[in-house]
Amino acid sequence: VKLETAIPPLLHQALQNLHIDALYSHQAKAIQKIREGKNVVMATPTASGKTLTYTLPVIESILETLESKALYIFPLKALEQDQLKALKEFTLPIKGQVKFPAAIYDGDTSSYRRRKIRESVPAILITNPDMLHLSLLPFHTQWEALFRNLRYVIIDELHTYKGIFGSHLAQVIRRMERICDFYGSRPQFVACSATIANPRSFAERLTGLPFEAIEESGAPRAGRNFLFLNPTGSPYTLAAKLFLDCLDNGFRTLAFTQARKITELLHTWILQDRPDLRGRVSSYRAGFLPEERREIEAKLVSGELLGVISTSALELGIDIGGLDVCILVGYPGTITATWQRGGRVGRTDRESLVALIAQPDALDQYFMRHPQDFFGRGFESAVVDPDNSVVVSRHLICASAEIPLRMEEEIIPLKNYGALLDQLVAEGELLRSASGKEWFSRRINPHRMVDIRSAGEGFTIFEEGTKRLIGKSNVPRVYNEGHPGAIYLHKADPYLVTQLDQGKKEVWVKQADVDYYTRALSEKETEILSVVRTQHLAQFTSCYGRLKVTERVRGFEKRRIFGQDLLSVHELEMPAHVFETMGLWIILPEGVSQRVKEEGLHFMGGIHAVEHASIALFPLFALCDRNDVGGICYPVHPQLEKPAIFIYDGYPGGVGLAEYGYGMLEELLKKTLSLIQDCPCLDGCPSCVHSPKCGSGNKPLDKRAAKFILEWLLGEKGPEKRGAEKIRKEPFPSSAAVLLPVDSEISDPRGDMAATRRPAWLKEEISRHRVLFLDIETQRSAEEVGGWQNKHLMRLAVAVIYDSLKGSFDVFKEDGVHDLIAKLKTAELIVGFNIADFDYNVLRGYSSFGFSTLKTFDILQQITSKLGYRLSLNHLAHKTLNMEKSANGLQSLQWFKEGKIGEVIAYCQKDVEITRDLFLFGLANGYLLFETKAGQRVRLPVEWDLSKIIKA
């Protein structure tokens, strides 16, 4: 389309040189609004030509007035380089006629170059928020030519300024506007964003200015194909194989991982498998030197590199040339980030492929089970709180050092911050003038004390001996990863923390060759300071308000890297991290706790699981990750005197996430219920209710109780309904076993036990042999004895045996353990579930007898050898027998400690019954039933023949 106002001849010449004869409709619309003096935010897809929409007006203004200046702000240095390159290419054909000086001013700019730039400020200055905060605003008198003539401020990748970074940038922008006002300029803002749900309101909250939004793109797009993969094995192994397959088929490929370590590991594995690709494949992540990053980017553009494995560092709009395939190793966390990363390939007229390889994580598995929701779901909203009191107070100090604060100011509304001003004066950070009308900073350069990318106090990490800088951390993260005894990972290398110096804000580490990692154990308390809003939803009440959160690291675990076995637990004395923030809380209705207990479920485990799962799904609605929000639950909160679940912003002062979550809480709980219902596990797993950051080691958790509680809260009937399941009739492929579909006639075995699962011939056959079905319960947990390798120290609480020859049960306590062992020696066959690895190892604490000599049939071993992975006894019982365990091991331990031996015996006997009936079902039918990750209920063929098993 054509612009309403003609383009100057020189610009027309520059466009023709780039073979641009016309503009897309969204470009023309945006340029027209910019020409009208309006602030504009563009939220159109990747590669839709957003850069051109601000390049034309900026250069047009320079042609009109040579003193005109523009400030370009990018979140990453690589984007700055990209922009400078694009500007040079655009202005090349008219370079001889008009000068368009542009320069980058960032941390990589030499001291000499910085001085030259300040002495002669270019028409276009390209920088980042950190440099604006630390180097431009504090020394604005040296940048008068920039701020007095500033016509445009360009903010690229607007959507990245969410959370605490966004709260800081909001204040940095207001400080910049204040300085511009001081010099008599009022710059116009142009922002570019990935597609988000709320570009206009987000831009307005970030800048405090009105905006016009351009959201509909007129640019053509090539076809994009999506492939969802949910591996039963390692997602990383599959990613490496797919990456190589793509390269071998001539497709240039980009793989995104979730962590630096995985990026480097994938790169290593690929080159180990294919050394011929060295120099044609590279990793890319933060932490690389600037010249290393630029070399990789240049090789991607030139085609020298066939593939790259990257963290999110390549997610943003760096020009990386034409690629064909994007492999997402794990769901990126948001729809916006997924499309942003997928948009890095197929950026010309070629079709592209985006392959999402799921990890055992709640969000990943949610979309694997609900792909229609992925494609039908709108983009998330970007959330920012410009009024975070902790952030505002720090920037008030910075602003007062730049230009004294005055109460009548409008850009920074001091009338709203009276309490903060009084507090800062009382703390000695601000000095009030004699007239009482102005405030000054006590410090000359307070900006150095403010890290705009974090909220807590900063700590520096050094290596012992060399005193080499290893990295940085902040409160509260430093208490979790920088405590004495912690293993700190840097570039995949392990370091042992030897000292945490609170006074100097230093952490000292030394290199360590260890086969374990550490995980902090913590405890939390939440105090309600004020209630801002209250609402009644479905069958519960929720509130939003100000909270005081107290977090304390009380110890840490050592876990083996391979297998994650618990090795040991260590206590710590660490200072509490206390902060005020904003949060929401759900007040559970009267009676729900009692009903959960009546169902034989664990109430605390249920609300704990609801808390974990709802936080895991929070990114479905807002741009964030699960580390941006925290949670805690109470069976009885001391202030409310009722059960409650809290979800709060994980940063002091709040960042707006809890407030946003409060507005969509019912929808969040519905999605949480769907996640828990659809996950095939029975007792909870990382795909539903486990949290990688749980300070109590994911204990207690009760998935069934969580489902019951959510159904109650949402107004559905409480107890789980049982009905015929709809089962797909096509087979589920597996390289480990042939999984046959279930016939509808026998898909849900019910009714008479003898008729359905124990035919007469089987009952008669097994009664002729002494087959003992064994299960034991212990007195101590693995944690209490220093890890699973110490099963022999767990001590016997109760053992139950079903004797097929007698047709009855025998119960043994610790004082009868030798009678138990003697009984086992009489058996023709002993059947159990995980008996070889667990039960026998517990009994080895009492006897040197060689239990491996006993004729044993371990059902779990049989299943693992077929599938390549484990299934729980409860899962098999539920899917095969329509039965469920009566409790769990944690509950049994608690009963024993409370002296409730009768409950322990009943629980143990129930497990023996389930084990027996699973074995008999397999003997009679030749299969067991289980449910796949995709929700398919299928057969697992078993070739069990009693006589052959006994004779083997």
Mark where each language-model region is.
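Acidic two-metal-ion nuclease catalytic site recognized across multiple nuclease folds
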Residues: 736-752, 756, 916-952
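Acidic, Mg2+-coordinating catalytic module of metal-dependent nucleases/exonucleases
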Residues: 881-940
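Acidic, low-complexity intrinsically disordered tails
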Residues: 711-762, 952
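Conserved DEDDh/DEDDy metal-dependent 3′-5′ exonuclease domain
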Residues: 801-875
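Extended Lys/Arg-rich polyanion-binding regions
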Residues: 351-354, 360-377, 395-406, 417, ...
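Conserved RNase H-like, two-metal-ion catalytic cores of nucleic-acid enzymes
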Residues: 748, 752-829
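Helicase motor core with emphasis on the C-terminal RecA-like subdomain
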Residues: 1-18, 22-25, 29, 35-48, ...
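Short cysteine clusters
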Residues: 679, 684-688
